[in-house]
């Protein structure tokens, strides 16, 4: 039964004779129905029933075969008979859908081939073909299922199809999937289900670690939506918390019990601080999830991550890693801290989202980058919302002031801004008040801005991983997006990993790119050591002549101050000699 056929019934008007005859027949039928109370009452009931069938995404409601009515005579009986026939067809369709479930390993191989999934490990569980499988295979909680429906999650993405059954089987896992592929939901759904099932203990059971506050806040919002109206034993609601500065203080001062929350989401340093102050005990944590794992295990966070692991002392602790990029060194670390993990790769490990149109634009020098942005605006290619990434706070500020002169609706976000300022800017950008957001890599990971049309890498990213995460702010949730990377003569080495990502993502690569994309061992080592990074000039469109005059004037003022200072010192010495 097509829902649109129900809603548009009787709205067709045609010009030929047959259609006129049909139209008049419809009107006569309508007049006849008006004289029959039973017929008029059965039609809305039938339509309502058909609508319910169409909206029953997960087939968790039993659709009645007959419309309950005290009187069904004449035409009403024909309608019920027709309805029963359509219901039989629907049930036949349902049986076809049920037969498409993942039952055998051969079914799993076909499904994985469709989305280029690579799963390895011992005793790998079968993936789910639909959310319906969660009901039949795992006795999925109805309240959690309703929250999924209310938030318009109707079909699992590839990473969700693989991750959810693995985590529900309580296995350690390393998962890599493109940006915007639904990784957050892939670990939230099984985590919530496991906490609902675990009725033995009270207190903190799930811990989610994120490298940035913005990503942690986003995970908290999504988790709160799915945990809405879910109650555990003794009518206690499932509690989710974001470890903010305020909550840390309350835990430290014992205003709030540490056993109040079932799930806590936090950045590494804040969590370690609270644990060291003995305000929070991680001994009961059974599920530890690292989102953006490659960042959490690099040299910036690895010591903090190690402290978190040592604080989680439960012998049955399950560890999970998610990211859009998983370097080999992170996988090596994972193998040492995990127990027989399953490895899930969707697509290519170092590839970007295939929905993103990636381009490289040669700008000659730093001044050429500003000209290139203004060219995009003039040609109508600068389609908001737009995110521009730079390598440093100083350069982000400088570009912000330059674009303000162009009267663009723009703002800048970086680590020097307060959390309140950052939250307000992000909210304005999401609501459409801001058209362009300039930022550093603080926003490159995880944060979900729906509908971003364009990402501009004003400065070439320092690694292929950074590039994948930056451009991953667009092309999310199945939408298309565009990413442009500016480069100069100085970036000849730094763009090689980016060209390789473009090739692996299926982008068209010109001949000159093919020639320079291959890297020697020495070049790879120099990039790892950061030698590919170049010192960049200040962002400015002020002419060189004006800059020279300003510099000369500044030097003259400084020289004048020195002369005055030396004269005053000489006068003081002369006065001392006379006395």
Curated annotation (Swiss-Prot):
<dbReference type="GO" id="GO:0003723">
    <property type="term" value="F:RNA binding"/>
</dbReference>
<feature type="domain" description="Helicase C-terminal">
    <location>
        <begin position="355"/>
        <end position="517"/>
    </location>
</feature>
<feature type="compositionally biased region" description="Acidic residues">
    <location>
        <begin position="569"/>
        <end position="579"/>
    </location>
</feature>
<dbReference type="GO" id="GO:0003724">
    <property type="term" value="F:RNA helicase activity"/>
</dbReference>
<dbReference type="InterPro" id="IPR014014">
    <property type="entry name" value="RNA_helicase_DEAD_Q_motif"/>
</dbReference>
<comment type="function">
    <text>ATP-dependent RNA helicase involved in 40S ribosomal subunit biogenesis. Required for the processing and cleavage of 35S pre-rRNA at sites A0, A1, and A2, leading to mature 18S rRNA.</text>
</comment>
<comment type="similarity">
    <text>Belongs to the DEAD box helicase family. DDX52/ROK1 subfamily.</text>
</comment>
<dbReference type="GO" id="GO:0030490">
    <property type="term" value="P:maturation of SSU-rRNA"/>
</dbReference>
<keyword id="KW-0547">Nucleotide-binding</keyword>
<feature type="compositionally biased region" description="Acidic residues">
    <location>
        <begin position="76"/>
        <end position="97"/>
    </location>
</feature>
<dbReference type="InterPro" id="IPR001650">
    <property type="entry name" value="Helicase_C-like"/>
</dbReference>
<feature type="binding site">
    <location>
        <begin position="177"/>
        <end position="184"/>
    </location>
    <ligand>
        <name>ATP</name>
    </ligand>
</feature>
<feature type="region of interest" description="Disordered">
    <location>
        <begin position="520"/>
        <end position="579"/>
    </location>
</feature>
<keyword id="KW-0698">rRNA processing</keyword>
<dbReference type="GO" id="GO:0005524">
    <property type="term" value="F:ATP binding"/>
</dbReference>
<comment type="subunit">
    <text>Interacts with the U3 snoRNA and is associated with the 90S and 40S pre-ribosomes.</text>
</comment>
<keyword id="KW-0067">ATP-binding</keyword>
<keyword id="KW-0378">Hydrolase</keyword>
<dbReference type="GO" id="GO:0005829">
    <property type="term" value="C:cytosol"/>
</dbReference>
<feature type="compositionally biased region" description="Basic and acidic residues">
    <location>
        <begin position="45"/>
        <end position="59"/>
    </location>
</feature>
<feature type="short sequence motif" description="DEAD box">
    <location>
        <begin position="291"/>
        <end position="294"/>
    </location>
</feature>
<keyword id="KW-0539">Nucleus</keyword>
<dbReference type="InterPro" id="IPR011545">
    <property type="entry name" value="DEAD/DEAH_box_helicase_dom"/>
</dbReference>
<dbReference type="InterPro" id="IPR044764">
    <property type="entry name" value="DDX52/Rok1_DEADc"/>
</dbReference>
<dbReference type="InterPro" id="IPR000629">
    <property type="entry name" value="RNA-helicase_DEAD-box_CS"/>
</dbReference>
<feature type="short sequence motif" description="Q motif">
    <location>
        <begin position="133"/>
        <end position="161"/>
    </location>
</feature>
<dbReference type="GO" id="GO:0016887">
    <property type="term" value="F:ATP hydrolysis activity"/>
</dbReference>
<protein>
    <recommendedName>
        <fullName>ATP-dependent RNA helicase ROK1</fullName>
        <ecNumber>3.6.4.13</ecNumber>
    </recommendedName>
</protein>
<feature type="region of interest" description="Disordered">
    <location>
        <begin position="1"/>
        <end position="99"/>
    </location>
</feature>
<dbReference type="InterPro" id="IPR027417">
    <property type="entry name" value="P-loop_NTPase"/>
</dbReference>
<feature type="domain" description="Helicase ATP-binding">
    <location>
        <begin position="164"/>
        <end position="344"/>
    </location>
</feature>
<dbReference type="Pfam" id="PF00270">
    <property type="entry name" value="DEAD"/>
</dbReference>
<dbReference type="GO" id="GO:0005730">
    <property type="term" value="C:nucleolus"/>
</dbReference>
<dbReference type="InterPro" id="IPR014001">
    <property type="entry name" value="Helicase_ATP-bd"/>
</dbReference>
<feature type="compositionally biased region" description="Basic and acidic residues">
    <location>
        <begin position="520"/>
        <end position="538"/>
    </location>
</feature>
<keyword id="KW-0347">Helicase</keyword>
<keyword id="KW-0690">Ribosome biogenesis</keyword>
<keyword id="KW-0694">RNA-binding</keyword>
<dbReference type="Pfam" id="PF00271">
    <property type="entry name" value="Helicase_C"/>
</dbReference>
<dbReference type="InterPro" id="IPR050079">
    <property type="entry name" value="DEAD_box_RNA_helicase"/>
</dbReference>
